[in-house]
Amino acid sequence: MEPPDARAGLLWLTFLLSGYSGAQAELHVSVPPRVEVMRGEQVALDCTPREHPEHYVLEWFLVDGTGARHRLASVEPQGSEFLGTVHSLGRVPPYEVDSRGRLVIAKVQVGDGRDYVCVVKAGAAGTSEATSSVRVFATPEDTEVSPNKGTLSVMDQFAQEIATCSSNNGNPVPRITWYRNGQRLEVPMEVNQKGYITIRTVREASGLYSLTSTLYLRLHKDDRDANFHCAAHYDLPSGQHGRLDSHTFRLTLHYPTEHVEFWVGSPSTTEGWVREGDAVQLLCQGDGSPSPEYSFFRQQGTQEEQLNVNLKGNLTLERVHRNQSGIYGCRVEDYDADEEVQLVKKLKLHVAYLDPLELSVPEELFVFLNSSSTVVNCSARGLPTPTVRWTKDSVTLADGPMLSLQSVTFDSAGTYTCEASTPTVPLLSRTQSFQLIVQGAPELKPNEIMPKSGNSWTEGDEVMLTCSARGFPEPKLTWSQRGDTPAEPPFEGRGWKSSSLMVKVTSALSREGVSCEASNIHGKKGHVFHFGSVAPQTAQAGVAVMAVAVSVGLLLLVVAAFYCMRRKGRPGCCRRAEKGAPPAREPELSHSGSERPEHTGLLMGGPSGGGRGGSGGFGDEC
């Protein structure tokens, strides 16, 4: 580390020296009058004669506490350099003289903080000296505080020990200040009832100083939440200052109860209602310290039923019942409290309840279609008095316990719900429902059909017929034609059942119609689907005629071929007749031996056939 500038802040000291033969000569010596350095650093002390005589000797002396001088070094210039001799005083590391003739003190300790005298001897020019003071600074260790860990009473009429603060191994002696909630405490050192401090300073073997400060205060109840700490202030070179703060701490105080609070800790209404079956907490709290005992009781007329005693101020009523409604009390057992302080607090606990709802009808209520009036009553018992309403499909039907059903239709069927609740007590509610079943003959709803195009149907058109029915008991759907699908609920619901039938439109079907019928034990109802006029399929009829003609022609050809094959072996069959009249012959018999006159007439030429002349002759016969 660089030594501080020994020339900084020079004080020129002028000495008047005597010369020979009564003549006087002046010699001035320049040294830094005060050198400040941190402990452990290095310092170099400069000593320079102002007149620069040709030859001189420079000597350094250490002045001890008694004022005695001890020679440290002798320095003599040789050209541009200085030759020095160091006289050891047992210092480690020893004193040194550098090439500029300065006295070097390495690793400065507190003991090096002395006065150093530089003496310059210049022969005929005279002798002069000057003193340089070295001041050593040391930063103390971290500030430590030891608070009083006992219980301090605010009822004491004198100052009590609060804490002890220590700042160790500093130089010069540090200073200690005290703070409450960040504000400095102006506490004197004189003993008094309100507060004071005591200070003890110790010089350690190292030469450093340790300071201990103890704070005494008369405490008040407001100090229960106060944060205290101390700080050590110390000096640094060049007029600088440092500060080391301790950690903050709080005190444990003993003070009597002045106020008591008693309330319901679990969820409750502003009126004090709690739900039956809940776990209810009763909380009691006094502002005394340490926490006193809390005694819980229930008021039974003029008597008190003792419930619990604890230090937590907490009483839990598990699964509270309606018969536990009443007046509850809390007593703070603080014998240091003032007689005027109210140590007993009471509250009234209201247990809200709601019994299961009762309906005047069974879970399934059967009524007949178009019945005049049916009244259903919902009985709700509870505290506070519940409000009741009737709903169906989340729609409110009536406010109050009475539900009147008039002119009942199938649309009236469904689930009716009685809802009871207590607006002042959240989440305390009940519901009860019944199913209304309407009995009666079926209602039928056909699905109207329209022609595919135009205003008429065409022969062969396919159409899906649908019938929907409802009633109780559930109606049965039947068709006048076969092929219907099983009944199934339609999209609209509400008890409707549907059945579908796929048919092809024909003229006969148009005349007769297609009917569907719904029936149950209470009656039946039907509907006939008509198709109106049905146009023939012209293009398709022509194709059918052509197909029949082709079939007939093919049949004739097959018959002719078969006949020819049968007659192939007979004489004169299938050959050309000779010219002239054929000879007379017997008629042929069939294979069965019977005559075939029809064949004879068909195969032989008639009277006009034999008279043909020229090249005509008989045509082929067969």
From Swiss-Prot:
Membrane-spanning ranges: 542-562
Membrane topology: Single-pass type I membrane protein
Residue ranges with Basic and acidic residues bias: 575-599
GO MF annotations in UniProt: laminin binding; laminin receptor activity
Cellular location(s): Cell membrane
Residue ranges annotated for the Ig-like V-type domain, each copy included: 26-135, 140-250
Any matching Pfam family: C2-set_2
Its biological purpose: Transmembrane glycoprotein that functions as both a receptor and an adhesion molecule playing a crucial role in cell adhesion, motility, migration and invasion. Extracellular domain enables binding to extracellular matrix proteins, such as laminin, integrin and other ligands while its intracellular domain interacts with cytoskeletal proteins like hemoglobin, facilitating cell signal transduction. Serves as a receptor for laminin alpha-5/LAMA5 to promote cell adhesion.
PANTHER family found in the cross-reference section: BASAL CELL ADHESION MOLECULE, CELL SURFACE GLYCOPROTEIN MUC18-RELATED
UniProt name for this protein: Basal cell adhesion molecule
Biological source species: Mus musculus (Mouse)
Gene symbol of the encoding locus: Bcam
